[in-house]
Amino acid sequence: CSSDLHIYASHADEIACSRRTIYSYIDRGVFQARNIDLRRKVVYKQRKRKTTASLKDRSFRKDRSYKEFLEYIAANKSVYVVEMDTVEGAKGTSPCFLTMFFRNCSLMLMFLLEEQTQKEVTRIFDHLTELLGIELFQKLFEVILTDNGHEFQDRQSLEYSKNGEVRTRIYYCDPNRSDQKGALEKNHEYIRYVLPKGTSFEKMTDKTTLLLLNHINSEKRDSLNGHSPYEVSRLLLDNRLHKALGLAEIPADEVTLIPALIK
């Protein structure tokens, strides 16, 4: 199941009316599809997200607050800005996702973690550094904005490679202000179309995680003028990223964002 925008953008030359007209027909019952079948015709209430971190020790935030993030990107306008977060599975289970989102093209990266810990996040950073090389990592991930979660508080292990080279700059949102990285928070909706809240990730593998990711990145968006994050990222990011991580475009008519995708 794809969004109405994705379907319209993929078949605009075959549809002899506007999207507004199609909505009107659906309202009047002309088609079998109903309003409830359309994602954006159903009101989505975003959950409030509480940080799991203890902020008693704020040393990890020194020189890396949201205010300082804004100052840095204002002075360095050409840098890629990446938002980072984790997505939890069912309560009482360990596996979760580490997600990263490129603001300039809406491309998301997603990695399966065995547990929501600093050690696991650092493992992914080290893996990406080895896979891409330090120079490409520095180019793509110069600035990362995340929340105050316990899994992100060992800033040094994230900012420095195993060889002691600076690979990124980590900045932190203000406490309880997940909206400051709202683009990624909103993009998590696509994960929940396939893995609804409360679903365990224990049966997920790196392979099924990549499959889900490629479907998400292949869905066309209004915010990208009817293009998909994958399409735009091929123009704006170094394509060595796509090759190294196995990012691939799913044909428009095959994009599927329902639970059956990985069952």
Short names for language-model regions:
Residues 1-2:
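Short, small-residue-biased leader/transition segments that mark boundaries at the very start
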Residues 7, 22, 85, 106, ...:
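Mobile genetic element proteins and their domesticated derivatives, centered on retroelements
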Residues 14-74:
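Basic, flexible linker segments flanking DNA-binding modules
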Residues 64-108:
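An active-site-proximal beta-strand-loop segment
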Residues 90-93, 110-135:
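Active-site beta-loop-alpha junctions of metal-dependent nucleic acid enzymes
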Residues 106-111, 172, 197:
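Short small-residue beta-strand/loop micro-motif enriched in glycine and branched aliphatics
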Residues 146-148, 153-161, 170-193, 202-214:
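RNase H-like two-metal-ion nuclease catalytic core shared by retroviral integrases
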Residues 197-263:
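C-terminal domain-tail junction helix/linker
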